């Protein structure tokens, strides 16, 4: 078998497409916007794992082109933020230089994929023409009260030397570098994402997204219905408010636990307990929220404040404790503890010998509890006028009763916290705020944007809580835009998520200097129809971009509320033994050599063939050999058939229509690995027919080439033209199948004797029952020894003879 010259074929058609674009802008066509999550310009470049998502999105984009749509398929660079800056620090080269070099390298590698990216739409988050509009969005949020300044303990990465949002802490560690996160009290800029919590949660049901991602976002937002209950303090006029989802258990609340940072702790702490309490507060301050929440129930710690609250229903005293498993920014920062019906409270009460009062029972009788009774329903006991009631029914009524009696109110609580938006680093968008002693915080006027990031010699993080920008006095010192008095610029920068929260809008209008996107183009080309990328940013980028889109909808910039109609998350490509590919592990597979040895088409196909696209898969270099053999076999089939003028037989037509049906069904279902295996299976069928008939008809070969084109575009274009196709394979239109043409003239029937298959009979499908039974007996011969008791024929399925 001759090997096709992949290098020559790819060069030939890339030059052809350069002169004859397959996806020219055409306003008359229906638009389809297919988008990759744009990459960080990493210094290590792309490996075969990165290729997977880009090949999937390009195959899907080319599919839409063949179906007659104008496809928006852009690419850009998420170049601000920690990944780029940390690499620059490691190399000892300014991030502006390393970023530019890395972009050039990755762009070269992306072009090896030969995806149909529209490079005229290219964006880079570090371009002042781009981040002018990132700053503009921040200013608009500031004007609407959604951006505000606050000093409080935040997640702090000692290695990256910057604050982190809650979403950037994974298992108590920095999601970028893996360092254990601590707490640091800092002045921060916040974005009030909590204002959008209900909408972010409710609108998930409108999205054609993987259920896994929607569930992750729903749990992160964490909406809970319940009541806020006010507990008066013994001997004081103050009160402490708690949030509970189970107001029906209020009679069983025997103690309160406050977050160590709760503002009432210092106020209510007795002199006798103060030293222990303050020591505990200091200890808790060094833990991240994730660490605090991860402690097992039996290992939880705490200190008694010496103060008591009064249960508003029964007047009983409730000791007030502090513990680091209660977080100041969750709910009210205080919880009422019902140890009889909460496993965590039960363990805490047992450890510190606190009272346990059962208020719900399965049968209405009190029992000695060895563990908390946590069933969703039961009969109320020890609950005054609520005794005998069903707890699940009382749950809603209890909230109403709390509100009616004046010591609480029905409310909704969220786990979602406001977004910590500032970073104490250099390589990011400057926050366009001026601090004036007279006017307070003042936004830089929009006509003065972009506020450009100044050049610095020392860009390494300071670790002091101030960014390197704080040391550039000529830049920091300015005049207030409002009153003209001396003022100082904000020196923190935006996080790496800022530009990525809206970049998908800019692609379609990337040269507009009057708007981040014109409303005309937003209405015409947006939102994104298909978004493809990893699941790792489910509660980061994907949540933030939804928030920003809703805000831009509210102020009239866009006419849609959700950025991405459909989302697909590809799995990771792993190295040998299922280990994640990384330079440090030495298991990175570069695509460069594979493209040289096998060609772009073979690598594209193997990226899809390696396994179900939504699942992780282990890379095996040997697998690409099989894909390459398939391409050679198909190429040779076309080469050998092209001049023979083979007339299509019924079987060729049947195979062709089944091929079209099966590939389309698998493609539309995103079963891309089975698409590739389908190509191999049907190619084998055609090779068998070619041996029998001397070749394959050109229409079947052209249809095969069109189906193959989204996946292996170069060889598909070559084979399409060898099969006498006109124009480009991408202008041929997606072939259609005919259900009737898919039916075979003959059927294969398993022949059974006493329920055991003895042979398979191939007969014309229109034979009568009598004819089929006669042929079946003839086929079985002496296998039918004995007395024939019964003949069974299930039409088109099976023949069975019962003999004795």
Predicted features and spans:
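Conserved oxyanion/phosphate-binding beta-strand-loop segments in alpha/beta enzyme cores
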Residues: 1-35, 65-74, 98-105, 209, ...
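Residue patterns forming the tRNA-binding/recognition surfaces of aminoacyl-tRNA synthetases
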Residues: 3, 11-12, 16-20, 90-240, ...
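Helix-rich, typically C-terminal accessory recognition domains appended to large enzymatic cores
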Residues: 78, 143-158, 223, 410-439, ...
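Alpha-helical recognition segments enriched in aromatics with Gly/Pro capping
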Residues: 307-330, 359, 476-613
């Amino acid at each position: 078998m001759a090997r096709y010259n992949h290098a020559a074929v790819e060069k030939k058609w890339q030059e052809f497409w350069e002169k004859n674009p397959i996806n020219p802008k055409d306003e008359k066509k229906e638009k389809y916007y297919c988008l990759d999550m744009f990459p960080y310009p990493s210094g290590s470049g792309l490996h075969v794992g990165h290729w997977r998502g880009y090949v999937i999105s390009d195959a899907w984009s080319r599919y839409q082109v063949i179906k007659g749509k104008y496809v928006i398929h852009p690419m850009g660079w998420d170049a601000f933020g920690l990944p780029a800056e940390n690499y620059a620090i490691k190399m000892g080269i300014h991030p502006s230089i390393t970023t530019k070099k890395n972009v050039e390298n990755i762009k070269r590698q992306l072009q090896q994929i030969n995806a149909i990216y529209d490079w005229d739409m290219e964006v880079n988050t570090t371009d002042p023409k781009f981040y002018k509009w990132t700053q503009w969005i921040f200013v608009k949020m500031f004007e609407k009260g959604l951006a505000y300044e606050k000093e409080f303990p935040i997640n702090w990465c000692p290695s990256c030397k910057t604050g982190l949002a809650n979403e950037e802490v994974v298992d108590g560690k920095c999601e970028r570098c893996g360092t254990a996160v601590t707490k640091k009290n800092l002045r921060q800029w916040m974005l009030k994402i909590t204002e959008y919590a209900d909408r972010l949660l409710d609108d998930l049901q409108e999205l054609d997204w993987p259920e896994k991602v929607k569930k992750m976002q729903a749990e992160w937002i964490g909406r809970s219905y319940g009541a806020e209950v006010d507990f008066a303090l013994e001997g004081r006029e103050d009160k402490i408010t708690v949030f509970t989802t189970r107001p029906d258990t209020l009679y069983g609340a025997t103690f309160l636990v406050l977050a160590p940072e709760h503002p009432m702790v210092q106020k209510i702490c007795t002199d006798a307990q103060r030293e222990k309490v303050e020591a505990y507060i200091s200890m808790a301050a060094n833990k991240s929220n994730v660490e605090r929440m991860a402690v097992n129930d039996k290992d939880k710690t705490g200190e008694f404040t010496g103060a008591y609250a009064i249960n508003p229903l029964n007047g009983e005293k409730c000791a007030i404790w502090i513990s680091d498993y209660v977080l100041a920014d969750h709910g009210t920062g205080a919880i009422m503890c019902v140890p009889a019906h909460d496993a965590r409270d039960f363990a805490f009460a047992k450890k510190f010998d606190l009272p346990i009062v059962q208020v719900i029972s399965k049968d209405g009788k009190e029992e000695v509890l060895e563990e908390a009774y946590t069933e969703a329903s039961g009969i109320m006991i020890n609950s005054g006028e609520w005794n005998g009631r069903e707890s699940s029914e009382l749950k809603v009524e209890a909230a109403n009763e709390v509100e009616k009696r004046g010591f609480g109110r029905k409310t909704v609580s969220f786990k979602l916290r406001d977004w910590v938006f500032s970073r104490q680093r250099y390589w990011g968008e400057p926050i366009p705020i001026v601090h004036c002693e007279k006017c307070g915080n003042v936004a830089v006027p929009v006509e003065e944007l972009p506020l450009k990031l100044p050049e610095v010699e020392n860009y390494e993080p300071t670790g002091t809580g101030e960014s390197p920008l704080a040391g550039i006095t000529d830049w920091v010192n300015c005049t207030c835009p409002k009153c003209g008095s001396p003022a100082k610029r904000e020196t923190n920068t935006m996080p790496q998520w800022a530009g990525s929260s809206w970049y998908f809008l800019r692609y379609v209008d990337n040269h507009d200097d009057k708007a981040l996107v014109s409303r005309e183009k937003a209405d015409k080309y947006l939102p994104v129809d298909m978004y493809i990328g990893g699941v790792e940013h489910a509660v980061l980028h994907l949540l933030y971009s939804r928030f920003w889109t809703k805000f831009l909808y509210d102020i009239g910039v866009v006419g849609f509320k959700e950025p991405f109609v459909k989302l697909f998350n590809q799995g990771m490509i792993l190295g040998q033994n299922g280990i994640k590919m990384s330079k440090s592990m030495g298991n990175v597979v570069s695509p460069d050599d594979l493209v040289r040895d096998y060609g772009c088409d073979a690598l594209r196909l193997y990226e899809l063939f390696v396994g179900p696209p939504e699942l992780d898969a282990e890379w095996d270099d040997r697998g690409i050999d099989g894909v390459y053999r398939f391409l050679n076999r198909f190429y040779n089939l076309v080469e050998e058939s092209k001049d023979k003028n083979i007339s299509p037989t019924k079987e060729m037509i049947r195979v062709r229509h089944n091929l079209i049906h099966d590939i389309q069904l698998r493609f539309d279902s995103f079963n891309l690995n089975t698409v590739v295996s389908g190509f191999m299976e049907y190619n084998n069928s055609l090779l068998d027919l070619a041996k029998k008939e001397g070749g394959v008809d050109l229409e079947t070969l052209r249809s095969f080439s069109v189906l193959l084109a989204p996946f292996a575009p170069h060889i598909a274009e070559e084979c399409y033209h060898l099969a006498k196709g006109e124009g480009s394979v991408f202008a041929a239109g997606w072939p259609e199948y005919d259900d009737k043409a898919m039916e075979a003239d003959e059927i294969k029937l398993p022949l059974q004797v006493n329920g055991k298959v003895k042979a398979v009979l191939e007969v014309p499908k229109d034979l009568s029952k009598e004819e089929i039974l006669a042929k079946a007996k003839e086929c079985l011969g002496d296998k039918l020894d004995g007395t024939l008791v019964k003949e069974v024929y299930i039409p088109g399925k099976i023949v069975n003879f019962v003999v004795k």
